[in-house]
């Protein structure tokens, strides 16, 4: 537990390091902390913070820099997040980019782009998970013994499947079957629909049962595509010296983007939490580069979390600026997708 003096000096050190990118010495801390302390006293406090693992001393400098542990304490207990001065402009840019009525994949890709543009780092979005339940089903007769099955998920995703049936069905029969399924089974998983159809088989005509079983089978055969990670603005990170100053670190950075496995795991973890999450490299095992942080937030469709978005940047990022960008974008993406 830090005393108020140590907390103030640590907060000042991290804020100055984020702003300038240079190790922070006692003279700078004396100037910006607002504390009337001698250089010797400040150096003693810095030594204590270093022993606690909150700051470290680069070999080439008398100043100190925050460690991942120091950043974690800062973002958890010292950071004051306020709406950015241009909050309305940020919201307006997000709204203008995320157009309701556009295909879901295009809206989600636009969210990654707007996160990158606003933060000047990389924007990342985990696309909505494929739903295992349905909101509505329709049958459309194409030709003899060939039917188009149209599945609408609660997220507004539309999936089409071709059915080859052993007999022909009239449009009225197809309407009857879809009305029955929608009235009795909407909102259920296809496995649950299959189970209930077995229980209700005696109450249904044989021709309707055959068609419904064919529809359920086709629905569960729709490939459950892997969660997709969309990234925008990777090149922005090439301008960040903390991430691109040596070849080994640069190689790690692009491994993150190429493989995406680690990002997928991180975004999946953050989708189970409420609100903005901050993952700090060197402190979180989910971030493979010590100099990298990821700020994430889940987004929803009609109150149900379906994915995650965020900003990838240096650990030395202005968290008080990036956090509102991520939060606003997540809220407006949720609103846009819910209006689809």
Curated annotation (Swiss-Prot):
Gene Ontology terms: biological process: negative regulation of DNA-templated transcription
PANTHER family: HEAT-INDUCIBLE TRANSCRIPTION REPRESSOR HRCA (PTHR34824:SF1)
Coiled-coil parts of chain: none
Name recorded for this polypeptide: Heat-inducible transcription repressor HrcA
Signal peptide positions on this chain: none
Role description: Negative regulator of class I heat shock genes (grpE-dnaK-dnaJ and groELS operons). Prevents heat-shock induction of these operons.
SUPFAM superfamilies the record matches: GAF domain-like, Winged helix' DNA-binding domain
Source lineage: Bacteria, Pseudomonadati, Pseudomonadota, Betaproteobacteria, Burkholderiales
Keyword Cell division: no
Keywords carried by this UniProt record: Repressor, Stress response, Transcription, Transcription regulation
Family statement: Belongs to the HrcA family.
Pfam families membership: HrcA, HrcA_DNA-bdg
